[in-house]
Amino acid sequence: MLFLVVFLHLYRFTFGPQHPAAHGVLCCLLYFCGEFIVYIDCIIGYLHRGTEKLCEYKSVEQCLPYFDRLDYVSVCCNEHLLSLCFEYMLRCCLSLRCAFMRLLIVEFTRSFNGLLCISCMVLDLGCLSPLLWSFEERDKLMTFFDLCCGCRMHLAFMVLLGILDDFVFGFVDFLLLLIISCLFVMDCYDLLFVGNRLFYLRLRGLSFFDLYDLVFNSLSGVLSRSLGMVWDCRLFSCYELYFMFCYDYCFCFIGDAFDRLFLRLFDMRMSLLICKQCFFVGFFVFGFVCLFDYLYCDITIETIIMLFYSLWCCCLPGISFACVEHPKGEYCLLLCFCVGLCSRLRLRCADFLHICLLDVCLRGFLLHDLVAVLGNIDVVFGSVDR
């Protein structure tokens, strides 16, 4: 009997954390057989700030700034998760006007995140012009955030039991022009990316996931819908007012990088259509924008000191859970509340689970495919290294 024994010599390379495509905070140990990747060992934690620990034994409004810094591309979606979880515990309902305004800013944030994800992925593939083009629309969206709350990055727009302030009267014209402009840009993006033969040949067949990864590794968001999973928290969990809107739902079956690019473009378009419906309905609904309005407080130094030191919104000890459809996937929050303070807080961030599967989806591919896939799965390390 003849036995054939083949000895493979593996080469080990270190990718990152200094590499720009690794965001400066990701280290990958790559094992190669020739030019092909055999195994990837991801080393994370270079940006670790202990967010969950820092939020312990603080009031919920003191935890909001930490959530701003989790996924610093989708700030309002992070704030929305914490506010929603606390409101579930209080079992309170917001006014229709406040709910519409929340959805408007959340869906604009989803488009804001998608623009950066797609443009940076295309930059990793070697194209510079789409990055500069997308930043024009991102600057318009930042101007929208600035008009809403006076900030461009760390917004602090969603306060507990409401939003920061009502929109100003002259804001309506700018908002309508912004929605029309973004919808026009989405048409151009479809022609540039989906209808482009070069992008199709480069991304089709790159980094497959399968149904085993979907079930046992908890894929969510765009990655799960690219495998044919008909699931979207906005559509099936019915949180906030998403059941009142008319929008389409899309999923693919191959599960490669091109499907994920197509679904991100589709999600951005649907977010803008939801914003359009919010604009035509929400601005004609009257109501309070916050159940506890600071504007009607007596503006004296004693009142300011009282608001600063007091726990203004307390509830009975308990546990609350909330899950939202974040631009990265499903974000879940478990909040334990006791004596007016947040005693325990646990986050389930989708991009942390997605980056753990780099080894699965890149075996047999080349080094330059790793850079393309890192941009394609949309990872922000503020939430990965929380």
From Swiss-Prot:
It holds the Pfam family Complex1_49kDa. Its EC number is 7.1.1.2. The keyword Cell cycle does not apply. It catalyses: a ubiquinone + NADH + 5 H(+)(in) = a ubiquinol + NAD(+) + 4 H(+)(out). One of its GO terms (cellular component) is mitochondrion. GO terms for molecular function: NAD binding; NADH dehydrogenase (ubiquinone) activity; quinone binding. SUPFAM superfamilies: HydB/Nqo4-like (SSF56762). GO terms for biological process: mitochondrial electron transport, NADH to ubiquinone. It is found in: Mitochondrion. The keyword Electron transport applies. Its main location: mitochondrion. InterPro entries: NADH_Q_OxRdtase_suD, NADH_UbQ_OxRdtase_49kDa_CS, NDH1_su_D/H, NiFe-Hase_large. Gene3D superfamilies: Cytochrome-c3 Hydrogenase, chain B (1.10.645.10). Keywords: Electron transport, Mitochondrion, NAD, Oxidoreductase, Respiratory chain, Translocase, Transport, Ubiquinone. Belongs to the complex I 49 kDa subunit family. Core subunit of the mitochondrial membrane respiratory chain NADH dehydrogenase (Complex I) that is believed to belong to the minimal assembly required for catalysis. Complex I functions in the transfer of electrons from NADH to the respiratory chain. The immediate electron acceptor for the enzyme is believed to be ubiquinone. Component of the iron-sulfur (IP) fragment of the enzyme. Component of the iron-sulfur (IP) fragment of the enzyme. PANTHER family: NADH DEHYDROGENASE [UBIQUINONE] IRON-SULFUR PROTEIN 2, MITOCHONDRIAL, NADH-UBIQUINONE OXIDOREDUCTASE 49 KDA SUBUNIT. This is NADH-ubiquinone oxidoreductase 49 kDa subunit homolog. It comes from Trypanosoma brucei brucei. The lineage of its organism: Eukaryota, Discoba, Euglenozoa, Kinetoplastea, Metakinetoplastina. The gene is NAD7.
